[in-house]
Amino acid sequence: MPLEREVERENTALSAELDGGAFLESEVFSEERLPERQYCVFRAGRERFCFSVLEVEEVVDWPIVTRIPLTPAFLMGVFNLRGTIVPLIDIAFTEGRRPGLLPKHVVVALLKADAHREDMRLGIAADEVIGTFSATEEALLDQAPADVPHCRGMLRHDDRLALVVDLRRLVDVFPVPVI
């Protein structure tokens, strides 16, 4: 107990020195701040997409992809990620990406389990991984394009809009084989 009081007294003295002797209320407690989320932003085709960095497991250079016969056009195939077979989808396939044009990176996302599914790794083809940025939930624009059902809204990033991907909807819209 005495040690805690001593630390508290030192912190109070330091606070008094920093604010000129008057105690200022902490902005954290005096002002209602919305929590910020960090997003990973990437480009697929002509569009920018993003999702929470908590869902991103890693970003890898383009791997050796094994095509699977008789699969939908959005499923580019599967690849081996340190012994785990990961399905690879192209969310920009509707933009008419030329058949010979391969993306440069794969964003590996981890979709956490719910009551009906197990944890699932999913590779998403990306032409460019732009980076990360922070935004509040309030900054989310709810006007996602109607023809992009796997997005839950848009966020402004570098004077452009990035579609916010909802991984659960993505897996519902683009069902991938469970491997």
Where are these regions (language model features)?
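An acidic, low-aromatic, low-complexity terminal/linker signal
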Residues: 1-179
